[in-house]
């Protein structure tokens, strides 16, 4: 699964990791199911997000607001996020963009952090 993350500027890694543990427990998804973290380009150098990715051992992939906004589908909108980033939702859109699949767990928010999970398409070959 791909983890989509949005966060306020200056959010510590600990806040992201704490919310992630709660989010995964609520969704009954193992941490081992995560393959990457995705967000918006504005967060490419966000220290707390980079540190959280380092602790998790996962790569961070970011996308421009235009690429996230172009994704079709129902996403949980936020006028505030739209005013700051230029796209109405970062976590869900980034997760879907990074996975190429469908939203598995919708936006979960607390203390300036938003998380979402999307499933990568899987087609076994025999």
Which role does the model predict for each range below?
Residues 1-43, 118:
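Conserved mixed alpha/beta catalytic, RNA-binding, or beta-rich assembly cores of soluble enzyme
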Residues 5-8, 40-42, 64-65, 87, ...:
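Fold-independent oxyanion-binding glycine-rich loops
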């Amino acid at each position: 699964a791909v983890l989509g993350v949005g966060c306020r500027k200056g959010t510590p890694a600990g806040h992201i990791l704490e919310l992630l543990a709660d989010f995964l427990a609520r969704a009954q998804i193992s941490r081992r199911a995560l393959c990457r973290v995705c967000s918006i380009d504005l967060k490419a150098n966000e220290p707390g997000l980079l540190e959280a990715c380092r602790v998790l051992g996962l790569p961070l992939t970011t996308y421009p607001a235009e690429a996230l906004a172009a994704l079709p589908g129902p996403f949980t909108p936020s006028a505030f996020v739209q005013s700051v980033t230029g796209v109405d939702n970062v976590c869900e859109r980034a997760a879907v963009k990074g996975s190429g699949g469908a939203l598995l767990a919708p936006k979960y928010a607390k203390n300036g952090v938003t998380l979402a999970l999307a499933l990568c398409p899987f087609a076994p070959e025999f």
